[in-house]
């Protein structure tokens, strides 16, 4: 209807093309998990094995384009086969079995925008830091425990001051909070 206002936000309008669900104006979101001391990794992998957190990550990112660094991809590769993944590597000779390669975040975001799906920034530390100002939402699993690690989730509070969702539970002996923050 000409002259009418759209009551549904444009980023929520979805349509089918070639039997794939596309989104008219996809969002850039970030997803991460960190411990109380902000640790999120050690030696290129997660320092914990919490099944519910892993299921949450896989379920939340299922229909989107995932952007991650090379080390994160190497830890994720067995799950990448049926997903849209862009792995970052500055090495032009690096090839990924189930992912496209980009040499920088801006190149990866450009590739992702052409796919018509929400984009998920999935780490590591340097990529989170660079992408934080560009993301509209942060989906964060906070684990109420401390772990040894060599990768830390950057401070997000300045970029995402508004908590809009919280689900708390205990799983595998750890108190977890699944949080969603917006700008």
Placement of each model-derived feature along the sequence:
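Polybasic, lysine-rich low-complexity intrinsically disordered segments
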Residues: 18-21
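Extreme N-terminal basic, low-complexity initiation segments
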Residues: 1-9
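Extreme N-terminal starter segment of soluble prokaryotic enzymes
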Residues: 26-30
């Amino acid at each position: 209807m000409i002259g009418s206002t759209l009551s549904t936000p444009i980023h929520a309008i979805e349509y089918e093309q070639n039997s794939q669900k596309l989104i008219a104006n996809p969002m850039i979101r970030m997803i991460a998990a960190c411990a109380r001391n902000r640790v999120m990794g050690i030696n290129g992998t997660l320092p914990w094995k919490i099944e519910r957190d892993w299921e949450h990550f896989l379920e939340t990112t299922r229909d989107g384009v995932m952007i991650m660094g090379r080390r994160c991809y190497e830890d994720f590769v067995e799950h990448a086969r049926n997903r849209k993944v862009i792995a970052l590597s500055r090495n032009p000779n690096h090839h990924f079995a189930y992912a496209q390669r980009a040499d920088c975040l801006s190149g990866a975001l450009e590739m992702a925008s052409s796919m018509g799906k929400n984009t998920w920034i999935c780490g590591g530390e340097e990529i989170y830091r660079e992408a934080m100002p560009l993301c509209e939402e942060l989906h964060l699993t906070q684990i109420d425990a401390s772990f040894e690690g060599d990768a830390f989730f950057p401070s997000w509070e300045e970029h995402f001051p508004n908590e809009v969702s919280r689900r708390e539970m205990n799983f595998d002996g750890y108190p977890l909070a699944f949080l969603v923050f917006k700008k």
